[in-house]
Amino acid sequence: MEHIQGAWKTISNGFGFKDAVFDGSSCISPTIVQQFGYQRRASDDGKLTDPSKTSNTIRVFLPNKQRTVVNVRNGMSLHDCLMKALKVRGLQPECCAVFRLLHEHKGKKARLDWNTDAASLIGEELQVDFLDHVPLTTHNFARKTFLKLAFCDICQKFLLNGFRCQTCGYKFHEHCSTKVPTMCVDWSNIRQLLLFPNSTIGDSGVPALPSLTMRRMRESVSRMPVSSQHRYSTPHAFTFNTSSPSSEGSLSQRQRSTSTPNVHMVSTTLPVDSRMIEDAIRSHSESASPSALSSSPNNLSPTGWSQPKTPVPAQRERAPVSGTQEKNKIRPRGQRDSSYYWEIEASEVMLSTRIGSGSFGTVYKGKWHGDVAVKILKVVDPTPEQFQAFRNEVAVLRKTRHVNILLFMGYMTKDNLAIVTQWCEGSSLYKHLHVQETKFQMFQLIDIARQTAQGMDYLHAKNIIHRDMKSNNIFLHEGLTVKIGDFGLATVKSRWSGSQQVEQPTGSVLWMAPEVIRMQDNNPFSFQSDVYSYGIVLYELMTGELPYSHINNRDQIIFMVGRGYASPDLSKLYKNCPKAMKRLVADCVKKVKEERPLFPQILSSIELLQHSLPKINRSASEPSLHRAAHTEDINACTLTTSPRLPVF
């Protein structure tokens, strides 16, 4: 009871939590005081002793039903006396007006200037109110299911069910409610008031200035120290509930479960934090373009801004800011390029062994969170157009995920353009067939052909043309698992003339289609040109040799294949090669590209061929005693039973 009496005594005296004086017998927790909203009564004036009789003080009534008593020293202005009391409550004198209460005229007050000598007001009662055109910071939260893609403004994670302020548009998860800033203001009005306190008020009641967008406000809040954010946004801070009824869209004020945050506790009426406002305006002023301030002489106001009758829409784009600070700042999720997450710093990759060199680059074995293959492309001083084309193709390659495709892991742009891919411990198909001369069974060769066709079918379904399909770019990973690499990248497989991309014959000569060699079209590469290269790979599998081995001159091969005088010798195919495979090889290497099949048809043909191959199945009537892990697992009684019974 003593605690309750002390609480009522404190509330009846009208002190706020921060200014309340508690004696030892009347100490109560903030939660008890928070349940009682302060209501100033006329009888309160007679209960308090006049502060002028004891010291040089002034009693001040503040917004949100708060009050304080300030000490006055000689030479201090009214602004100096009240600055600290306003600052701890997040107020600014420019946003408020001060009045002297006239007791001889009940209910009336006289406005004072902030530069008034405070000594002349000792013993008086003052009242500080918000200016009429300065909005309060009351959030208007409502539950919302975001059917469109949305992200939490606090944790930047995907948001489906959460809350949204109907006034400022701030959206967040329920578990992020403790970090919601208390700011919910018309930032254009705040900015106009602070930048141009003496400007002429327009027809709408406020100076007509470009408004500060919500995005910039949130960026300024994100730059605040964590301690400052928690100071003004924590739900455990003492707040004063207003006596006005809550809006329809606000959350219910009933007591919630202690396991879930009370979102309403951050939606109480609080003043705007001055430091947050200054930070937002400072960042906006630095980023504003000087040309935005220019206007015709007829439309200029005394402050240098135009004053249209209708509000000026918020600026949608922010002027670029140069400097290292902008580079080091984390970019918002909505503005960051998705390929940003795939770019690898060159300092993070350690190159070790040089694996080989091709017509488009050099391959190294490297370390980046494990073994990787790094292909440094032969592109010296890429132009902006070439660099952008490379990034566009990387955006396509990073979406490839298939069991028969070499995994793309990232790219590098510093010093040289480079591609980082999965490392395959096995050798390439070229080494197996022509260097190590590995002897494969026919069913193994057919399975390699099927996996290769399956991977190429996936690439073509993604509208990716390989352009350099050959046995050197087919890897056998962990046994006989096929991995296709070095696909796409038309940027580095083309010749550039200034800013224009010019197609040229690319790839190894033996695997190049006749139309690619002739280069009669602007872009001869197509799905059918990849099919021709795949047909040469089938020829290697079914013969163990390279085509045109009897011709030693490279230029002669180019001339004869391009003119249609030479084609792979199909008589060298293995004798045990199935007839369906022979027909498939012949169809893939046809000289007219329209007559070649596409990979969906090729894949179905090989799968049908695999099912038709004869298989030796184990007899189901004979036991497999040798499969037992231990001989004692076999029941000895079974072995000594009557000969009439079967032995298992």
Curated annotation (Swiss-Prot):
Phosphorylation at Thr-269, Ser-338, Tyr-341, Thr-491 and Ser-494 results in its activation. Phosphorylation at Ser-29, Ser-43, Ser-289, Ser-296, Ser-301 and Ser-642 by MAPK1/ERK2 results in its inactivation. Phosphorylation at Ser-259 induces the interaction with YWHAZ and inactivates kinase activity. Dephosphorylation of Ser-259 by the SHOC2-MRAS-PP1c (SMP) complex consisting of SHOC2, GTP-bound M-Ras/MRAS and the catalytic subunit of protein phosphatase 1 (PPP1CA, PPP1CB or PPP1CC); this relieves inactivation and stimulates kinase activity. Methylated at Arg-563 in response to EGF treatment. This modification leads to destabilization of the protein, possibly through proteasomal degradation. Keywords: ATP-binding, Cardiomyopathy, Cell membrane, Cytoplasm, Deafness, Disease variant, Kinase, Membrane, Metal-binding, Methylation, Mitochondrion, Nucleotide-binding, Nucleus, Phosphoprotein, Proto-oncogene, Serine/threonine-protein kinase, Transferase, Zinc, Zinc-finger. InterPro entries: C1-like_sf (IPR046349), DAG/PE-bd (IPR020454), Kinase-like_dom_sf (IPR011009), PE/DAG-bd (IPR002219), Prot_kinase_dom (IPR000719), Protein_kinase_ATP_BS (IPR017441), RBD_dom (IPR003116), Ser/Thr_kinase_AS (IPR008271). Residues 331-349 are annotated as: Interaction with PEBP1/RKIP. One of its GO terms (cellular component) is cytosol. Zn(2+) 2 binds at C152, C155, H173, C176. Its EC number is 2.7.11.1. The modification Phosphothreonine is found at T268, T269, T491. SMART domains: C1 (SM00109), RBD (SM00455), S_TKc (SM00220). Residues 349-609 form the Protein kinase domain. Changing S257L: In NS5 and LPRD2; shows in vitro greater kinase activity and enhanced ERK activation than wild-type. CDD domains: C1_A_C-Raf (cd20870), RBD_CRAF (cd17135), STKc_C-Raf (cd14149). Changing L603P: In CMD1NN; shows impaired kinase activity and reduced MAPK3 activation with this mutation. The modification Phosphotyrosine is found at Y340, Y341. Changing P332A: In CMD1NN; shows a mild increase in kinase activity. Residues 220-334 are annotated as: Disordered. The modification Symmetric dimethylarginine is found at R563. It is linked to Noonan syndrome 5: A form of Noonan syndrome, a disease characterized by short stature, facial dysmorphic features such as hypertelorism, a downward eyeslant and low-set posteriorly rotated ears, and a high incidence of congenital heart defects and hypertrophic cardiomyopathy. Other features can include a short neck with webbing or redundancy of skin, deafness, motor delay, variable intellectual deficits, multiple skeletal defects, cryptorchidism, and bleeding diathesis. LEOPARD syndrome 2: A disorder characterized by lentigines, electrocardiographic conduction abnormalities, ocular hypertelorism, pulmonic stenosis, abnormalities of genitalia, retardation of growth, and sensorineural deafness. This is RAF proto-oncogene serine/threonine-protein kinase. It comes from Homo sapiens. The lineage of its organism: Eukaryota, Metazoa, Chordata, Craniata, Vertebrata.
